[in-house]
């Protein structure tokens, strides 16, 4: 009884997740279909496993007293219902499986403008969120806490943070100068004229040299922030070039989306698999400024 009380108390303490929910037509028994067609649920917690609190999904099991559990929890409790001690994990709750399968919820980004409806399961929701056009993006300025959909972020950056040295024009070479400061991550934000897309050039000092990456701040939605870039570094007669036919997209500037997750490759061995430019230390001058040139083009406009 102690376990039941604790579970109940924890369930009451949890904040209720309320999102617009509808039930779509699904096949099956008449009773299951009728429930699916007519019901509207607001408390999404009702569709969570009462033991682990994760979203329910087939197979869903119930004991003879009607208590339910997901398949993984049945194994964890050794097929003994924690509420009544009867066997659980042998009889499936088919109607509840039909209901869960039929539930369609609004995207978590609905309040920002997304109108997509997605099945109520972790896999579908995660898959949509990865490519949702309304995923929030963060202002790259270190002291700024602004977040918003990418179009609003671009307007915000133009209004609040624009400088004379941070513009770029597609198809033309622009200066990309970065201060190299020890192991600290340095970055430069470039914005297409007016309130256009934001491109971030990042560099850091690694064991093999300076690593430079170029990313566009944009959601991973198809057709948004689709750019290519060409980067050039010169030191006397020496020249290193880097070309990315498909610029990576990020939502937030951080070390995690820089070279920490990339496998270092010497510049002379760099191939199509590399997504950063490596500049050996012996090619650096004594100045603390890394002077490069960058040409950014929209996908499909490459020459």
From Swiss-Prot:
Q: Where are the zinc fingers (SIAH-type)?
A: 102-162
Known catalytic reactions: S-ubiquitinyl-[E2 ubiquitin-conjugating enzyme]-L-cysteine + [acceptor protein]-L-lysine = [E2 ubiquitin-conjugating enzyme]-L-cysteine + N(6)-ubiquitinyl-[acceptor protein]-L-lysine
Q: Which residues bind Zn(2+) 2?
A: 139, 144, 156, 161
Q: Would the keyword Transferase turn up in this protein's UniProt record?
A: yes
Which intervals of the chain are annotated as region Disordered? 1-30
State which Enzyme Commission number(s) the record gives: 2.3.2.27
**Top-level taxon of the source organism:** Eukaryota
Asked if the Swiss-Prot or TrEMBL record annotates the protein with the keyword Metal-binding, the reply is: yes
Its keywords, alphabetically, are:
Metal-binding, Transferase, Ubl conjugation pathway, Zinc, Zinc-finger
Q: In which pathway does it act?
A: Protein modification; protein ubiquitination
Q: Name one Pfam family in it.
A: Sina_RING
A Gene Ontology biological process in which this protein takes part is: protein ubiquitination
Q: Listed GO molecular functions?
A: transferase activity; zinc ion binding
Q: Where are the zinc fingers (RING-type)?
A: 49-85
**Binding, Zn(2+) 1:** 107, 114, 128, 132
- Region annotation (SBD) maps to 99-286
**Family to which this protein belongs:** Belongs to the SINA (Seven in absentia) family.
What does it do?
E3 ubiquitin-protein ligase that mediates ubiquitination and subsequent proteasomal degradation of target proteins. E3 ubiquitin ligases accept ubiquitin from an E2 ubiquitin-conjugating enzyme in the form of a thioester and then directly transfers the ubiquitin to targeted substrates. It probably triggers the ubiquitin-mediated degradation of different substrates.
Entry domain remark? The RING-type zinc finger domain is essential for ubiquitin ligase activity.
* The protein, known as: E3 ubiquitin-protein ligase SINA-like 3
């Amino acid at each position: 009884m102690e376990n039941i009380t604790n579970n109940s108390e924890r369930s009451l303490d949890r904040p209720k997740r309320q999102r617009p929910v509808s039930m779509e037509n699904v096949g099956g028994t008449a009773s299951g279909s009728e429930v699916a067609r007519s019901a509207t649920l607001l408390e999404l917690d009702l569709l969570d496993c009462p033991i682990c609190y994760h979203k329910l999904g087939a197979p869903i099991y119930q004991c003879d007293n009607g208590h339910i559990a997901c398949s993984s929890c049945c194994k964890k409790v050794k097929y003994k219902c924690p509420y009544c001690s009867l066997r659980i994990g042998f009889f499936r709750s088919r109607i509840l499986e039909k209901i869960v399968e039929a539930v369609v919820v609004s995207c978590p980004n609905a309040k920002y403008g997304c109108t997509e409806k997605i099945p109520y399961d972790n896999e579908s929701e995660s898959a949509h969120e990865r490519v949702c056009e309304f995923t929030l993006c963060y202002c790259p300025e270190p002291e700024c806490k602004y977040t918003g959909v990418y179009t609003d972020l671009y307007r915000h950056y133009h209004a609040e943070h624009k400088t004379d040295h941070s513009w770029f024009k597609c198809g033309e070479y622009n200066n990309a100068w970065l201060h190299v400061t020890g192991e600290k991550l340095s970055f430069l934000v470039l914005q297409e004229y007016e309130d256009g897309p934001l491109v971030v050039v990042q560099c850091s000092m690694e064991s093999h040299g300076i690593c430079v990456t170029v990313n566009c701040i944009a959601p991973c939605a198809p057709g948004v922030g689709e750019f290519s870039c060409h980067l050039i570094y010169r030191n006397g007669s020496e020249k290193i070039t880097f070309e990315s036919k498909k610029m990576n997209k990020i939502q937030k500037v951080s070390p995690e989306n820089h070279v920490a997750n990339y496998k270092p490759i010497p510049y002379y061995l760099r191939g199509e698999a590399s997504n950063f430019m490596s500049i050996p230390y012996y090619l650096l001058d004594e100045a603390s400024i890394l002077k490069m040139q960058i040409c950014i083009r929209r996908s499909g406009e490459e020459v």
